[in-house]
């Protein structure tokens, strides 16, 4: 981008001039600055423009850009050495400078600047950059000697005067329709009948919540905590969907039921932004007021908007808090017996006189608050592992319905499962007592209890797919031949207090529910006891590793794991995805070792394990009717679009795609956001599309 002058070496030779101690042209800077209407040329250290040495890795020559076509629209830079005569500067300026389209001269950006012994200036900065900088400079100092050929004009679309080439919202072709009879009169009657008035949602209190204050609540107990936000009011929360930001205070009205009967006081504390609301009576160190339970009239508090910026975005939680806590215990003189009584505090809210919304947006567009979904799928398929059971993803399958709770997370970090998004040993403690009391062999039904659970005392990592109903176990040390549709694994000692006396690592089968005789009854809901069926003659801590699937039929190793909803285990809710807008749920298929099939049984996974881990760690910005779309491309060139929805399930644009045409390894590329109701695209060999 830069153009270099043909310089005489003697003018800038370090052997002839030492610029730190000798200046051969003492009037050089003054003469140069005079061409630009300034008195001096400021000195700038280019190193100050970079944060650290790592920044230089991105550009090894910041003064000579690698993209001249792009920067040509912004401007051109030129520099000269101090050894050059001032007339060369003037000549170079006149040769380089040009005229704008309107005939005005292209004045250089003011002022030029110096680095070391080199002076830079911009004779042709580009019209947009030039005029923007001039407008900013002139706004800071009206007396600054700058030249602006054409001043910018900023206006709203609704301004009355506008250029003819701009269409405003009040322009357009009027379509003839039947006139509304007496429109002004009808509008007046409607206003009179409904009481509609401008911004009426600001003028009255709306119910927000209720607080229970009991005689058993001790001094310092926090009854109510609320940060300043539009969601405090139902109308503000509704209107907020159309705006990007807000500012202003809110008023909160408290009404205590039973006033005049109860005694006691509560304190209303205003906590500034950025300070924790924990601490009980310590909160009374902040500004506060006291409210007596005998107060018969409602009490109104104002939560002021204390902020360090001009306005808040809709996700801003660094706002003031209103805390209501017990100051004096509630007393009911008519209370009889030891049972406590309580009163109810009704909370109503409205916007303050200074409350306003800012920056209009369509209600259907979502604010970008969460993490970027572009990293939800690893780029290379070599790193794709299923979230149901260990195994690398080898294919995909379209399903009319997809269901999975365990290790399945949505974009808000929520799960209905009981396992962390990682495949590891299941940490339990086994009881040596055999529930099959009549058994005289070494195989028994043993209760295991979770040592590491995240929900409902279910062992973290417990399998979510095996037979529902009765399961009979063949009590022999040689085989589990009668066991069908079950997960088998191995057990290893873990942090035992005494030496283990096992002669070998036991093989176990997973079950839960109730155990009677040589069978267990497994329900769809994980409840009751959890069992490890195997050879245990000693209690202690163990780890269980699911590693094998006992199939039902001899042929093909049985149905895929995850295919039947009745066999999918859950705690209460089973997240389910179904066809939407022409897009079908897709399962990630991996393989798991199985009987009757040397290639293993297929496993339907709702997510890639890495996706589950990322969703568990952070909130992602995926709207309720949106998809984060990735292009999955095979080595042979075939591809299809895969979209991840807000509930964590994945979709593709057809119900019968030829995934067999894909050649592994695959590569995932983030495309962007799309509507859930727009059909996703694909280009797979042998696939046909019906319009």
UniProtKB/Swiss-Prot annotation:
Keyword vocabulary terms for this entry: Capsid protein, Host cytoplasm, T=3 icosahedral capsid protein, Virion
InterPro entries: Calicivirus_coat, Rhv-like, Viral_coat
Record flagged with keyword Nucleus: no
Domain of life: Viruses
Site annotation Cleavage: residues: 157-158
Pfam families linked: Calici_coat
Keyword field contains Cell cycle: no
Disulfide bonds: none
Gene Ontology cellular component annotations, sorted alphabetically: host cell cytoplasm; T=3 icosahedral viral capsid
SUPFAM superfamilies: Positive stranded ssRNA viruses (SSF88633)
Effect of residue 158 to P: Complete loss of processing by the viral protease
Function: Capsid protein self assembles to form an icosahedral capsid with a T=3 symmetry, about 38 nm in diameter, and consisting of 180 capsid proteins. A smaller form of capsid with a diameter of 23 nm might be capsid proteins assembled as icosahedron with T=1 symmetry. The capsid encapsulates the genomic RNA and is decorated with VP2 proteins.
Assembly and binders: Homodimer. Homomultimer. Interacts with the minor capsid protein VP2. May bind to VP3 and Vpg proteins.
Descriptive protein name: Capsid protein VP1
Organism taxonomic ancestry: Viruses, Riboviria, Orthornavirae, Pisuviricota, Pisoniviricetes
